[in-house]
Amino acid sequence: MQAHDLSAGGDVLVRVHETARTAARLHGLPRAEVTLINVSENATFRVDDPQTGARSILRVHRLGYHPTAAIASELAWLEALREEAGVRTPRVIPAPDGSRVLTVPGEPPRDCVMFEFLPGTEPPEDRLVDGFERLGAVTARMHRHARTWRRPAGFTRFHWDYDAALGSESRWGHWRDGLGMEPEALAVLDRLDKELRERLHRFGRGSGRYGLIHADLRLANLLVTGDGPPSVIDFDDCGLGWYLYDLAAALSFIEHHPQVPEMIEAWLRGYRTVTALPAEEEAEIWTFVMFRRLLLVAWIGTHTGVDIAAELGAGYTLGSCELAERYLTGRPPA
């Protein structure tokens, strides 16, 4: 399984850091301090201007994940959510020439986007259930907007359907090439794969169930300040998928947590303050949780340069097998 370019090792992050410095200069910030704060599907930097004290966030895109038109489409949805749905999202800071997506020259060139710095912190871990109720409510507002929004001409984002996640496209690599994939693991996860494919096909892609989603709407991508409305960040994975996938993504890496049933109930409670969720869809929640879990087995194998992937490693595959056995035998996995 081939790692994506930001996990390829060598001096790639040194070169990406230089790209970030160049992007800051092109934004009129020649003396800015540029600090790497996260690497995943892109590299995220904090940009501090020592002259004014202003702070912003710069995203340097990985290669081959999004064409420039898809990045522009993401930014269009952020703006629409903020202006039409009342969802707090970061504003884009255009370059002096008006460009919202800045292609920085280099070998190879990379697309970059500068965002305003939003105040707030991730909801505290000791109040996970409370955080999930807020998350459910803001997710519902985003889904309600997505169902009626008229996408602008040229709008393009990828899909998170079965083929894109686990099938012929396998955007993050194939789970069969994941870490710790012993014969026993292959056997149980292959059974899981087949069950997921069949159930998702039966669930269908009707307009009420499938549309534009954030696709990584974890608590880590919420910023809260006191009891006010949260801000939603990191839309880089947004695309077309099942709305319930946003709940599954919220449970990423913690699917085994003993409070997961309470987290799900809290998310549903928050969601239903905004819009309905039919019982027949609620019945498939664990199908989507396991769909996301199997996708993350593949993700860990291709993102070895990301801290959480290195930390979880083959143990995540083993835990996935345990959850899969419970799911396949009709027992709630948590």
Task: Locate the predicted segments by residue.
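A cross-family kinase active-site recognition segment
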Residues: 123-187, 208-210
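ATP/Mg2+ or Mg2+-diphosphate-binding catalytic cores
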Residues: 2-7, 174-175, 295-334
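Active-site activation/catalytic loop segments of kinase-like enzymes and analogous catalytic loops
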Residues: 244-276, 291-307
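ATP-binding pocket architecture of kinase catalytic cores
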Residues: 49-151
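Conserved NTP-binding catalytic cores of kinases and kinase-like/nucleotidyltransferase enzymes
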Residues: 1-97, 226, 333-334
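A glycine-centered beta->alpha junction motif in the catalytic cores
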Residues: 63, 98, 110-125, 170-180, ...
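All-alpha amphipathic helical-bundle segments outside canonical DNA-binding/catalytic cores
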Residues: 130, 277-289
